[in-house]
């Protein structure tokens, strides 16, 4: 049947342009081929947006899922494909479907499984991390300026430096009251690990770069993991558990420390990325003895981070 009425093309009652209109929470199964490796299967959640001029009542909403479906099918035919590349292709296709749009944006989040082993026993377990891919496009005349988005979110453990120092002071006071000499106290302090409270830390890094630059998602995952007090694991035998607790308490970190460490490692790792690369670094620590959670964030360009770090060398 040919539908004669296209309400979306009507003029709106209130003629105001809209920054982003689209669909969210759109779930799709994505299969990424890899050269000489098994494909990666991802259950991904998409957000897809275009801008809307003041002269048009609505976007053609059903075109967004249609575009995603088509790009996913095409990705199955290629030898190798990445999340952000899929998103770039979706953005290009959105401009074809929404001829009135001058801006388009796609963001996808997926659970990504890696096989990792525990630190002492070497037991393998499946570890799940969140990975993000995306793209933004701005259309000027017939040219489309693209940027791509790559990111990850990883869970780890942090140990509070403040509480640990309080416990250390209490121990020193108790040892002095029991008659230990300063020399003996120093030997004892060097031999023991002081208690503190822990948090489950959630670290996130998202990079937005011009098209043409490649970022390996595992590099981002490793940076986040190494920036907390210790890594967590799906399987821990007794020796592993002791090791993780010991390592986390030997490496106490505030939520602020985690963000600064991630920023430093991003600068060190991604020397090939241009200064205009946008960087979002975020850490949330879920407190164990407080009713609140701790939060820290850094938003900057890679060039700003480089200059800030150089100024203190």
UniProtKB/Swiss-Prot annotation:
Stored PANTHER family: GTP CYCLOHYDROLASE MPTA
Source lineage: Archaea, Methanobacteriati, Methanobacteriota, Methanomada group, Methanococci
Catalytic activity of the protein: GTP + H2O = 7,8-dihydroneopterin 2',3'-cyclic phosphate + formate + diphosphate + H(+)
Annotated site (May be catalytically important): 160
Domain of life of the native organism: Archaea
Catalytic activity, EC: 3.5.4.39
Organism of this sequence: Methanocaldococcus jannaschii (strain ATCC 43067 / DSM 2661 / JAL-1 / JCM 10045 / NBRC 100440) (Methanococcus jannaschii)
Name this protein carries in UniProt: GTP cyclohydrolase MptA
Name of the gene: mptA
Enzyme class: hydrolase
């Amino acid at each position: 049947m040919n539908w004669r009425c296209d309400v979306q093309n009507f003029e709106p009652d209130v003629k105001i342009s809209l920054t982003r209109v689209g669909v969210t929470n759109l779930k799709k199964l994505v299969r990424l081929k890899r050269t000489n490796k098994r494909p990666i299967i991802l259950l991904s959640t998409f957000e897809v947006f275009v801008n809307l001029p003041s002269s048009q009542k609505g976007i053609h909403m059903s075109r967004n899922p249609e575009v995603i479906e088509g790009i996913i099918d095409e990705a199955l035919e290629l030898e190798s494909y990445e999340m952000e590349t899929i998103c770039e292709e979706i953005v290009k296709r959105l401009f074809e479907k929404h001829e009135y749009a001058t801006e388009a944006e796609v963001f996808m989040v997926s659970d990504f499984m890696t096989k990792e082993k525990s630190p002492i026993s070497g037991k393998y377990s499946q570890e799940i991390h969140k990975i993000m891919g995306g793209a933004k496009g701005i259309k000027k005349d017939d040219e489309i300026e693209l940027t791509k988005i790559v990111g990850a979110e990883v869970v780890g453990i942090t140990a509070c430096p403040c509480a640990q120092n309080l416990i250390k002071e209490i121990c020193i006071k108790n040892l002095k009251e029991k008659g230990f000499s300063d020399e003996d106290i120093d030997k004892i302090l060097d031999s023991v690990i002081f208690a503190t409270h822990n948090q489950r830390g959630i670290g996130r890094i998202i990079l937005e770069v011009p098209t043409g630059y490649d970022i390996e998602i595992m590099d981002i995952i490793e940076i986040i993991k190494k920036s907390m007090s210790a890594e967590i694991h799906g399987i821990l035998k007794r020796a592993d558990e002791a090791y993780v607790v010991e390592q986390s308490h030997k490496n106490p970190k505030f939520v602020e420390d985690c963000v600064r460490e991630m920023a430093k490692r991003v600068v060190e790792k991604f020397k090939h990325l241009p200064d205009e690369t946008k960087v979002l670094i975020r850490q949330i620590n879920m407190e164990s003895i407080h009713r609140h959670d701790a939060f820290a964030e850094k938003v900057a360009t890679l060039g700003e981070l480089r200059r800030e770090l150089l100024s203190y060398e």
